[in-house]
């Protein structure tokens, strides 16, 4: 089986904006004399996602036409499905050094030169359009809204040319062994003979409800891609290295190895709920995935979105417009009566019988120094979590 037999990337072509060899040497030399844009952690995540093709069909940060079209219609100006504008925001003093038709060097906050952008547009950041469209709220308490409001007032649009995506400022967060680009996962799926692949997105350790959804999807697909997000998340989320240890542990003990893959997605969380669910699905399509698990309040935060808004939003697209198939799962819970995971579709509701699980509840238990019970987490995963929580508590005592 060849990788070209897999699902077509969003927009039809898998983008690659990495520059190698002599071209890279020339770009580094040129960058030394260019104005500089220092990237935030979120922007560095976006740069990587564009460069490796995960954000295909984007070849760079969006210009004003795409920005407006994405905000109003969840499609780029040419009609390709895309729900969230990927922007490069700068402050006034940086904007003053830039000009349309020129170029700028993009550097990480640690000083690493990451690439160069061709400046095709400089335009005002219309947060009055973006916030209610993308986040369905302008509440500054929403972490995604807050992140946008803290960005610069000007947006730089244009294609990018990327030299590196993994500066060495946080080597423990890079997970090189599991950091596969879309071209790599597609090759791996083809080598394994997987024609249908389900992906599970997570920013939390996998608890029993997650495991249930994953295994339901494995019954209908050739393989499962556990694809945790390891880019920028909000304060309070369990660190990526701890989560990765949890994923490796549960796969080792409770999943079939030759039907399961673990790779990381280096994207930043936006907490945009329904629109981010569509983004996550399209990104997984670029990775070669055919089915995407969408559970309760996917990519949500607080009470900003309805329980199944992230599932219903897919109905706003025409049949076939989005290549990947959303797997819309009901809220799963542990049933004492059934002694296993159930949903409203699989088991009758009995008063006081079901224990509903969430990553937030697991974190609350850990903060209180309590071990997550077997109904919440597999014991091997609970061991990892309680060891981390104990060490963290000791460090802050």
Residues covered by each model-derived region:
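Active-site cores that bind ATP or allylic diphosphates and position pyrophosphate for catalysis
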Residues: 1-397
